[in-house]
A protein has these predicted regions:
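NTP/phosphate- and nucleic-acid-binding module
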Residues: 1-368
Length: 368
């Protein structure tokens, strides 16, 4: 976020999008994965086990731990370690073993930038064996709410090659505060309707709104005098439209295997005039005349009179994606016709050479 706590993004859903979007199939909830709230229904076991120290030689990853202890990831407590960018201070975050950390949420909570930790011997941390019990050192320790109230968990013992089983968060961890640091997952619980109906899709951000509030005006000590003669901080908003992203999004939504199919409203030209065999005098003369006539009538035309094969010309026209193609060729001249073909292949008509300009105008008018 640029500032403030509220923003809205306008997304086009597409498999090639750069952002991941959480979507509820049961209600109208939509959220960027960076901001989507992760709801967890924690289920505490009725019978609480004792905390037991277990020797786990050469076991480092959460997958290896669960396989060795014959337990599921969701019944484990894993540690994810970061460092503050400014001074490499360690942040140790505990989260349920089957979940991933949402680093944007974590950064927003901490209020400073972080990076994945490089754990050294001097840190006092033992990579692969870090746990919340008897964790000692100058660390910032955080707990994801997926662990709140949970029991009978496995976790690191802060001793090399040892883990605990039977961890009870209420019994064994005093004063823990729980916050939402987890990424929402496919099939997760919707924060709005409460149903396990979250799907994750990709999307392109084409616009955004940031409610900046007084974040920047306060930092710059910018004020104005209100009607009562008192100094007030202006409230700011930021409204962005990605012009380049919009063009890319339109191409993504309107294309085929041969290139873009520009909608008439945003097309760079309305008509692509193709003079096939422009070395033919009659083709060249008529195409030049039609081009000038269309321009005089306010039609935006791209004119291709290159001395290339028809296949090359049409292939290039597909790549450009102009909504309508007008074809002048020796064969058409002999038949006294002009071809009008739509880029999306929904229209293909022959019109008289004498009325071609008027017919093209009618076609454009009908397409608007």
């Amino acid at each position: 976020m640029m500032g403030g706590n509220i923003s809205h993004e306008f997304m086009l859903l597409t498999p090639v999008g750069e952002d991941s979007i959480a979507i509820c199939t049961e209600c109208d909830y939509r959220a960027n994965m960076e901001a989507a709230e992760c709801l967890i229904h924690n289920e505490k076991n009725a019978d609480t086990q004792e905390l037991v120290l277990v020797h786990t030689p050469n076991i480092h990853t959460i997958e290896d731990v669960c396989e060795f202890l014959h337990c599921e990831k969701k019944t484990s407590c894993k540690a994810v370690v970061y460092q503050r960018n400014s001074d490499d201070h360690y942040i140790v975050l505990f989260i349920r073993g089957d979940l991933e950390v949402n680093e944007t949420k974590l950064t927003n909570y901490l209020g400073y930038d972080i990076h994945p930790a490089i754990i050294t011997e001097e840190s006092g941390l033992h990579a692969g064996y870090i746990g919340p019990v008897n964790l000692r050192g100058d660390f910032t320790v955080l707990y994801d709410r997926s662990l709140e109230g949970m029991n009978n968990l496995s976790c690191g013992a802060n001793v090399c090659e040892y883990h605990y089983t039977g961890l009870d968060m209420r019994r064994d961890i005093e004063g823990a505060e729980y916050h939402d640091f987890a990424k929402i997952q496919e099939g997760g619980i919707c924060p709005h309707c409460g149903k396990p109906a979250i799907t994750v899709s990709r999307g392109i951000e084409v616009g955004n709104i940031f409610q900046l509030g007084t974040k920047y005006t306060k930092s710059m000590n910018m004020t104005y005098i209100d009607a009562n003669g008192e100094a007030q901080y202006p409230v700011m908003g930021c409204y962005g439209i990605g012009i380049g992203r919009l063009a890319a999004s339109i191409c993504e939504a309107h294309h085929d295997d041969y290139g873009p199919i520009w909608p008439l409203a945003v097309a760079p030209w309305q008509v692509h005039l193709c003079a096939v065999r422009a070395d033919d005098t009659k083709v060249q003369e008529y195409a030049d005349k039609l081009y000038e006539e269309l321009q005089n009538k306010g039609v935006e035309v791209i004119y291709d009179d290159r001395r290339v094969r028809a296949g090359v010309m049409f292939s290039d026209a597909d790549l450009i994606g102009v909504p309508f193609r007008v074809i002048v060729s020796p064969r058409n001249i002999k038949q006294n016709i002009v071809e009008i073909v739509s880029r999306d292949k929904s229209l293909s008509v022959n019109v008289s050479m004498a009325s071609a300009a008027e017919e093209i105008l009618k076609t454009l008018s009908a397409a608007k």
